[in-house]
């Protein structure tokens, strides 16, 4: 059964396997999504590079984009074979590239095609096929139109709807589309009341766990995006307060785990910066956090991370962890729980 309560949004050039691994160290319960992946890339590209992920990343969803039912169905089959727990169809990307390719938000103009796509994908796989959509297009959305779109997709077998609670303005940039169209989370709340048999996840502009908890009283789930990338420890209390799991490790312990991960990845030929760039915000708002960023940005190596870690060990200590007497009476940090992501 898909647990929709809390998830991290698919973000292009952000939610790759390295960032997802980092997030999993902060929260065991949160649901992870890949970057948006076009169906043709799955069919013709390097599948191992595009789709491979570590077992620790579960639960994880593959987000696909495209406009051809057969191609998307085949891409969904491939994703399921790789072990993804969910296949999500992007109906929200407003970018010029998406419009040229006939996928993303512009597909909302052709609900008959959307239904055909979703039916084909649903018949191709056994895992849930879900959608991530906007309220509508060009600021002309109405609640009635949104509800009709949901009904049409539900008839095609979709049970889970992730709704970015904004319209898509196709003449604007992707960044502007995250900021200019007004948020209408109340429409998503209303959808849950009108379609109680369906699952609704609201998304857009949610910056804190407190905000997420507010919406969780009204809908089935909340998806956070940029806030998590800007500070992964927005999710610090998510396991305890949302999933009833023990509190996760401190920032310093997560940094140490990422150091071990980076060492392993470098041996596989991964450029260090591919991992380090996602770690820049790990100490956001903390003492010496800016120096941490600078050391990683300038050094871009395992050695640079080691220097930054030594700095944080001296300046921050074992944040959030109890201390116990050392062998000679000095104070030392008690070891954190030896839990790894599952």
UniProtKB/Swiss-Prot annotation:
Residues 313-331 have a biased composition (Basic and acidic residues). Its EC number is 1.3.1.-, 1.3.1.91. FMN binds at residues 10-12, 63, 132, 164, 203-205, 225-226. GO terms for biological process: tRNA dihydrouridine synthesis. This is tRNA-dihydrouridine(20/20a) synthase. The gene is dus. Its cofactor is FMN. The record marks 90, 97, 175, 178, 290, 293 as: Interacts with tRNA. Catalyzes the synthesis of 5,6-dihydrouridine (D), a modified base found in the D-loop of most tRNAs, via the reduction of the C5-C6 double bond in target uridines. Specifically modifies U20 and U20a in tRNAs. PANTHER family: FMN-LINKED OXIDOREDUCTASES SUPERFAMILY PROTEIN. Pfam families: Dus. It is an enzyme of class 1 (oxidoreductase). Residues 313-342 are annotated as: Disordered. GO terms for molecular function: flavin adenine dinucleotide binding; FMN binding; tRNA binding; tRNA dihydrouridine synthase activity; tRNA-dihydrouridine20 synthase activity; tRNA-dihydrouridine20a synthase activity. Belongs to the Dus family. DusA subfamily. Keywords: Flavoprotein, FMN, NADP, Nucleotide-binding, Oxidoreductase, RNA-binding, tRNA processing, tRNA-binding. Gene3D superfamilies: 1.20.120.1460, Aldolase class I. The active site is at 93 (proton donor). It catalyses: 5,6-dihydrouridine(20) in tRNA + NADP(+) = uridine(20) in tRNA + NADPH + H(+); 5,6-dihydrouridine(20) in tRNA + NAD(+) = uridine(20) in tRNA + NADH + H(+); 5,6-dihydrouridine(20a) in tRNA + NADP(+) = uridine(20a) in tRNA + NADPH + H(+); 5,6-dihydrouridine(20a) in tRNA + NAD(+) = uridine(20a) in tRNA + NADH + H(+).
């Amino acid at each position: 059964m898909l647990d929709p309560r809390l998830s991290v949004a698919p973000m292009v050039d952000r939610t790759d396997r390295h960032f997802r691994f980092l997030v999993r160290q902060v929260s065991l319960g949160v649901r992870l999504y890949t970057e948006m992946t076009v169906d043709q890339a799955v069919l013709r590209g390097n599948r191992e590079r595009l789709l491979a992920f570590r077992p620790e990343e579960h639960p994880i969803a593959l987000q696909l984009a495209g406009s051809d039912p057969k191609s998307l169905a085949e891409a969904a089959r491939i994703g399921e074979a790789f072990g993804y727990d969910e296949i999500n169809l992007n109906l929200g990307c407003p970018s010029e590239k998406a419009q040229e390719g006939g996928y993303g938000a512009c597909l909302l103009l052709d609900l008959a095609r959307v239904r055909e796509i979703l039916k084909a994908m649903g018949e191709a796989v056994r895992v849930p096929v879900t959608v991530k959509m906007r309220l509508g297009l060009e600021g002309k959305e109405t609640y009635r139109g949104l509800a009709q779109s949901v009904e049409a997709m539900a008839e095609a077998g979709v049970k889970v709807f992730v709704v970015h609670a904004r319209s898509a303005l196709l003449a604007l940039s992707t960044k502007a589309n995250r900021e200019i169209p007004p948020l209408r989370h109340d429409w998503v709340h209303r959808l849950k009341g009108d379609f109680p048999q369906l699952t609704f996840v609201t998304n857009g502009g949610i910056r804190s766990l407190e905000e997420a908890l507010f919406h969780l009283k009204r809908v089935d789930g909340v998806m956070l995006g940029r806030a998590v990338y800007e500070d992964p420890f927005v999710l610090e209390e998510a396991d305890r307060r949302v999933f009833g799991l023990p509190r996760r490790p401190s920032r310093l312990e997560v940094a140490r785990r990422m150091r071990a991960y980076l060492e392993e990845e470098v041996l596989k030929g991964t450029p260090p910066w591919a991992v380090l760039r996602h770690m820049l915000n790990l100490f956001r708002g903390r003492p010496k956090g800016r120096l941490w960023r600078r050391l990683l940005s300038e050094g871009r190596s395992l050695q640079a991370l080691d220097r930054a870690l030594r700095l944080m060990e001296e300046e921050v200590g074992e944040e959030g962890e109890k201390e116990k007497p050392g062998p000679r009476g000095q104070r030392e940090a008690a070891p954190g729980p030896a839990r790894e992501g599952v």
